[in-house]
Design a protein with these regions (language model features):
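Glycoside hydrolase catalytic-domain context in secreted enzymes
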Residues: 1-195
Length: 195
């Protein structure tokens, strides 16, 4: 239940601060794609269903609600929104995305991210939003999760990086790299992409 989760994270945090040599606090991260993935929290429709609304205000409010529920249990970081552009229908994670349109994904993703992060840092109600999955994760070869993305630079920049660019410009706190590779280079080690 949420109370047990909060109690456990508080105990870990207290230990890290009071009983370790450097006293560095732990940053707790939680999955928050369409609700905080924990017992006793609100579950919203998947991102693909949310996309049919085109409702930025609703996405902002949903982001706020998810952030509050995660913060009440001790989280500092929320994994979401998923900004992947999904154009491989065999991919098993399409429902985590807002679909195949970069403009729609950018619009709703930025609103969701802003709701999660809020206007004021450290207010106890918001957390850092983590944009997922950088980059071109929604077009895995043969639909296999984590498989390489066969994509040219023009399409990468015009479609697949567009939502991330908009969210970073709007103040996104963190980004999660994807598990795939582009042109044979894993995204997690792709110096060109990451810098």
């Amino acid at each position: 239940n949420p109370q047990s989760g909060a109690k456990a994270l508080n105990a870990l945090q207290k230990y890290a601060i009071d009983s370790t040599r450097l006293g560095i606090p732990i940053l707790f991260a939680e999955e928050c794609p369409h609700g905080h993935m924990a017992i006793g929290t609100t579950v919203f429709p998947t991102s693909l269903a949310q996309a049919s609304t085109w409702d930025k205000e609703l996405m902002y409010k949903m982001g706020e609600t998810i952030a509050l529920e995660a913060r009440l249990q001790g989280a500092n970081i929320g994994y979401g929104p998923v900004l992947d552009i999904a154009r491989e229908p065999r991919w098993s994670r399409m429902e985590e995305t807002f679909g195949e349109d970069p403009v729609l994904t950018s619009t709703l993703g930025v609103a969701f991210m802003k709701g999660m992060q809020g206007e004021v840092q450290n207010d106890g109600k918001h957390l850092f939003s983590t944009l997922k999955h950088f980059a071109a994760y929604g077009i895995p070869e043969s639909g296999h999760n984590g498989a390489r993305a066969n994509i040219g630079m023009r399409q990468l920049f015009s479609d697949y990086l567009h939502p991330f660019k908009k969210a970073v410009e709007a103040g996104a706190g963190t980004i999660m790299t994807s598990y795939n590779s582009i042109d044979g280079v894993p995204c997690t080690a792709n110096k060109y992409l990451l810098s």
